[in-house]
Amino acid sequence: AEIFYAESLEKLIPNMQDAKPTIMTAVPRFYQNLFTKINMNLKKQTGFKKKLINQTLILGKKMLKKSNLNFNEKIINFLCQNLVRKKIKKQFGGNLQAFISGGGALEQNIGEFLNSIGLPTLQGYGLTEASPVVSCNLPDLVKVDTVGPAFRTNKIKIAEDGEILVKGENVMLGYWGQKEETDKVIKDGWLYTGDIGEIDLNGYLKITDRKKDISVNLGGDNISPSKIENILCLNEYIKQAFVYGDKKNYLVAILVTEKVENESKIKIVLENINKNLNLIERIKKIIVVDEEFTIDNRMLTPTLKLKRKEIIKNYKHRLDKLY
């Protein structure tokens, strides 16, 4: 095997065309951007092309759910495979067998879209203390709202409070020279991951949140900021989102947006998103900022996750004004 590293995000597609990878790993934000760009391009199509793309998505989702295609659907899907999926796959080198997503939650409709359009996308889960992979979806049975079944070398169980526990030969012996810290996360051979999740009837693991990231509002309700942030970022006008509201009576958000003529456009977008959220999850007020969250300004981790404490520290004064 050979390993290739992309020169930059901007040069990723040309790099993939040169390298012709069979497997590629990336964090969810990459797939989120990819979803937005492909979607915007597909929306420009008209006539027969538009109908064919719509059928590609409809039939792709049907196959993803292991539903049988009738005779007519099989013929249409044959056309979709050769006229749509193969062409899209060729843009990524032509040999791609799977995208692997890890390092955070991949939104379900992004996973469905990419798999349906001809880009097999498998979501997995792991952490450094588990060397680092715990589970991953299987190519022949993809459940996009999960991170797949545990590897054969692993065992997974869910603690009473919902925390995911992992045991196996890949789990670390401990933190070097830090017995006290080790004892906090390894008990009776089980690694306490700090993630909250559940296991379905097929043994597929579903991550619901990071234990330390769950917010509790003034009413005592548990709220997942990352879930709401992912939903916000599905909109083509919202590039990044940070949701805030721990120990508050409503939620607010900091949004990094695409350039729009006026802020009222973003407010209309937010109103539409709020309609599909539970009452306690709705965003009441927003701050629109120009500066993106990046690794360089210390708002993102190296795996492109939000550094919540750093963002709160930088915007505390403006956040407080929203309450």
Predicted regions and their residues:
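AMP-binding/adenylate-forming catalytic core of the ANL superfamily
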Residues: I158, G168, L173-G174, I196-N297
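Residue-level signal for well-ordered alpha-helical positions
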Residues: N15, K37-I38, Q178, L218, ...
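Acidic/polar alpha-helix N-cap and adjacent early helical turns
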Residues: N297, Y315-Y323
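Short acidic loop-to-helix transition motifs that present clustered carboxylates
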Residues: S8-L12, A105-L106, T128-A130, D221
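Alpha-helix/helix-capping structural signal
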Residues: E10, R29, G104-A105, N170, ...
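Conserved AMP-binding/adenylation subdomain of ANL enzymes
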Residues: A1-N82, N95
